[in-house]
C-alpha cells in the first residue's frame, strides 16, 4: 500500500460501492512474528517477503520492518479516505492499526519447568527492544498501535497488559484493541480490563 500507486484509492472505491466505512486496519499476522519464537507454522500466515528463508531472527527483523511500513500505509490509507469518511460516525478520530505482537515467553506461561522472574523480565525486554522502534515509526506517521490482548501475545491478561505498557515506557502510540471474548475464555474480568486501561 505504501508504494503501490492507486491501491488505497481502489480500496476506498470498494468501500464506497458498498456504503462501508473504515476506522482501523489490521496487522495481526505480521505483528505476530515480531516477537514470536518462529517455527514452520508461521510460514503459512506471513507474506513470502517477510518469511524469506525462514531463519527465525531474520523473520522477526523483517516483520519489524514491515510493521514500521504499516504505519506509513495506514497514514496514506486514512488520508486518502478523509473526504469519504467525513459523513460517517467519527469513532475515536485517531488513525489506528490493530494487531498482535507475538511473545518470546508465552510458551512458558504454565511455569513448568519453573520460570524465573528474570526469564519473564527478559521476555518483556525483548518486546520493548523490538517494538520500541515500531512505535517510533508509528509516532512519525501519527498512527496508534492497538494490541489485541490475546493468548500467545506479550499481553494476554491484566497483569501482562500492565507490564507491556511499562516495557514500552507508556509510549503514547501503544494501547489496546478491546476484544472481550479472549479475556472471557481465560477467565479474565473483561469489565475490570476496561476500567484498568
Indicate where each model-derived feature is located.
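Active-site acidic/histidine proton-transfer and metal-coordination neighborhood
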Residues: 17, 33-178, 185
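Glycine-rich, proline-tolerant flexible connector loops at the mouths of alpha/beta enzymes
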Residues: 1-16, 101, 106
